[in-house]
A protein has these predicted regions:
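N-terminal recruitment modules of adaptor/scaffold proteins
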Residues: 2, 20, 25, 53-55, ...
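Canonical phosphoinositide-binding patch of PH/PH-like domains
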Residues: 60-61, 397-415, 580-600
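Short aromatic-glycine-enriched beta-strand elements
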Residues: 386-391, 571-574
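Short amphipathic, charge-patterned alpha-helical segments
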Residues: 1-4, 64-84, 161, 167, ...
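Eukaryotic mixed-charge, acidic/polar low-complexity intrinsically disordered regions
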Residues: 3-11, 15-41, 94-213
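Conserved, structured regulatory domains from eukaryotic proteins
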Residues: 21, 43-48, 98-122, 180-208, ...
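Short, contiguous acidic and Ser/Thr-rich linear segments
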Residues: 1, 52-70, 239, 405-410
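Eukaryote-biased recognition of intrinsically disordered, low-complexity regulatory segments
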Residues: 37-61, 220-223
């Protein structure tokens, strides 16, 4: 047949062995292929339906023969998302409470969230800035005030149909369309349900075809690792928006716990962001060539970048380490006593707190002393009730000692909470991040304050609020819509002056401040244990947790880790720490490879530095996460 076709994208796929025959210099005999083997000559690039963190679907053509890590990098490059190593692909979780539906029903549900337009192909067109890189000479691609694109749209979406109409659709927040759509979504009811969701993470070291992903299958693109490097409004409008969306949905679907005051603060920020997103879209339709004051943009960038670089203009004596000393109420709940909090004169030096019965006795021997290195620090705050508690779980040989500290006011709480958080990481108050940590805590508390003059809230804006789309179902059951609306509008007064990007960054910061933030749960059985427990993995530690309450039983820091390995035959993960501490567990609901990849992935992310201008070291990632390279 005289048919002209480009076969360059095709390759041989061996279905029986689940492998691609990509080494064209190898003979079939070297691959071990016999005469009865069935080989499929198929395109390597196939369509995939990706659900983005904002819950919208977009069709993408992805290389099914690339390892997932490389495929995700290509997808992020197309979407202009820097640091693709933080994201990965996840299979859609099934709601166990619902009966099995027909595929057609699922498709109809998904179509309600379909983005208009485009098929986006990784690699098509020029990419404006190379994701995964950091460079001081990078040209800003977004307005640091509202996140709108500064570049010609074709520069970062190529010839894609996304460059028509609204080019910044991926950088624009999508409000929840209706309470009904929110109600249909799967909400994990317990910690075990949250742990089961993590069964769905794909293996980053194997290709999509090897993991039986089909063409046109729906997968979720999510931030997998909760370590967000160099979030910068000038380059990361899409990344920041998708991160905001992921955090927003985590709160609305109750995947992470928050207090009532925090929920109203999150709702107020959402309301503010939704309003500004509409205004920003309208402004840029009318004024697409708006000039940006580079000095203002740089100052704003310094103000609200989550990580890095702020140094105090007042330099104290660099040889001295700051200390805290004040009366603090201390409580040990595990002691068999009816006594409550007892006031002590407490001094915080280095990473230790010493408690004295009075200020006058502070030169003598302390009544209690605790080293906070490696401890778990959890806030317990109620602004309206003036409750400012710090819960400490301090590691000891037999488990964790629980200590509660009660502060008198916000200022005292912020200073001591910041010191506790740094001490848990082995840092002192001399660390440059201490002042910023104190300010972040105070800012977080300030956003939760009730407005003393609710009558100042204009009546006319009450009508454009839909509380059913701004708070989680738990609070909808607890209060009437009118009550929730009033509280959201009160909380909105604390954030009303923020710019669009600042509001998103504040939302992400507040999400990061929640006690449960950044912990990925897995169901596990520990060596010597008789029942199923939870293993929690965070960016800097492993946590053994009670499966019913979520309380930490024991914590181990990665900074003390010597090595970890997997016995692939019995599916056991073993982690060795300093002082001959050895932790072994079997994952009961998930392949141990997923847990191994989380540990190795966080170690890989901890090696990143701002002065690196080279691209990602893929081979290093595979060495740390694949287990067999």
């Amino acid at each position: 047949l005289d048919v002209k076709k480009d076969w360059s994208d095709h390759a041989l796929w061996w279905e029986k062995k689940k492998t691609w025959l990509l080494k064209t210099h190898w003979t079939l005999d070297k691959y071990g292929i016999q005469a009865d083997a069935k080989l499929q000559f198929t395109p390597q690039h196939k369509l995939l339906r990706l659900q983005l963190p904002n819950m919208k679907y977009v069709k993408v053509k992805v290389n099914f023969s690339d390892r997932v890590f490389k495929a995700v990098s290509d997808i992020c490059k197309t979407f202009n998302i820097r640091h693709p190593e933080e994201l990965s692909l996840l299979r859609k979780p099934r709601d166990p409470s619902k009966k099995k539906k027909k595929k057609l029903d699922d498709q109809c549900e998904d179509d309600a969230f379909e983005l208009e337009g485009p098929l986006i192909t990784p690699g098509s067109g020029n990419i404006y800035s190379s994701p995964g890189l950091y460079s001081k000479t990078m040209t800003p691609t977004y307005d640091a005030h509202d996140g709108s694109p500064l570049s010609p749209t074709s520069a970062w979406f190529g010839d894609s149909a996304l460059s028509e109409g609204n080019p910044g659709i991926l950088a624009v927040s999508q409000p929840v369309t209706s309470p009904e759509s929110l109600a249909k979504m799967y909400k994990p009811q317990a910690l075990l349900d949250k742990a089961k969701i993590n069964q769905g993470w794909l293996d980053s070291s194997r290709s999509l075809m090897e993991q039986e992903v089909k063409e046109n299958e729906a997968l979720l693109l999510r931030f997998k690792y909760y370590s967000f490097f160099d979030l910068n409004p000038k380059y990361d409008a899409i990344r920041i928006n998708q991160l905001y969306e992921q955090s927003k949905w985590a709160i609305l679907l109750e995947e992470i716990e928050c207090t009532e005051e925090e929920m109203m603060m999150f709702a107020a920020l959402q309301y503010h962001i939704n309003k500004l997103s509409i205004m920003s879209s309208e402004n840029h339709l009318n004024n697409s060539d708006k000039d940006v004051d580079e000095v203002d943009a740089a100052l704003l960038d310094l103000e609200i970048t989550l990580e890095g670089g702020k140094t105090s203009t007042i330099l104290g004596d660099i040889t001295s380490i700051p200390e805290l000393a004040d009366y603090i109420k201390v409580f040990k709940p595990k002691k068999l006593t009816l006594k409550g909090y007892k006031p002590y004169w407490c001094t915080f030096k280095d990473t230790s707190i010493s408690c004295y019965k009075s200020k006058e006795e502070s030169n003598g021997t302390p009544a209690h002393q605790m080293n906070l290195r490696g401890c778990e620090v959890t806030p317990d705050v109620n602004i309206s009730g003036q409750k400012f508690n710090i819960k400490l779980l301090i590691p000891v040989a037999e488990g964790m000692n629980e200590i509660w500290l009660r502060c008198d006011n916000e200022t005292q709480y912020a200073s001591w909470m910041a010191a506790c958080r740094l001490a848990s990481k082995g840092k002192t108050m001399a660390d440059s991040s201490y002042g910023m940590e104190v300010q972040n805590i105070l800012s977080f508390l300030k956003m939760q304050h009730l407005n003393p003059d609710p009558q100042l809230i204009p009546e006319q804006i009450n009508t454009d609020i839909n509380p059913e789309c701004l708070v989680s179902p738990r609070y909808l059951k607890k209060y009437k819509n009118k009550q929730i609306t009033a509280r959201i509008l009160e909380a909105h007064q604390n954030v009303a002056q923020m710019s669009l990007i600042e509001a998103k960054m504040r939302f992400i910061q507040a999400w990061q401040s929640l006690p449960e933030f950044g912990i990925t749960h897995f169901i596990a059985r520990f060596q010597g244990g008789k029942k199923e427990e939870l293993i929690g993995i965070a960016y800097n530690r492993l946590i053994r947790m009670d499966a019913s309450t979520g309380d930490a039983v024991k914590t181990w820091r990665f900074s003390n880790m010597k090595q970890w390995n997997v016995n692939w035959e019995i599916k056991m993960v073993t982690v060795e720490f300093a002082d001959d501490v050895r932790v072994s567990f079997i994952c009961t609901e998930v392949d141990c490879k997923v847990v191994h990849e989380f540990i190795g992935g966080y170690i890989f992310l901890s090696t990143r530095a701002k002065d690196q201008n080279e691209s990602l070291d893929e081979e290093m990632f595979y060495k740390l996460t694949s287990g067999w390279v």
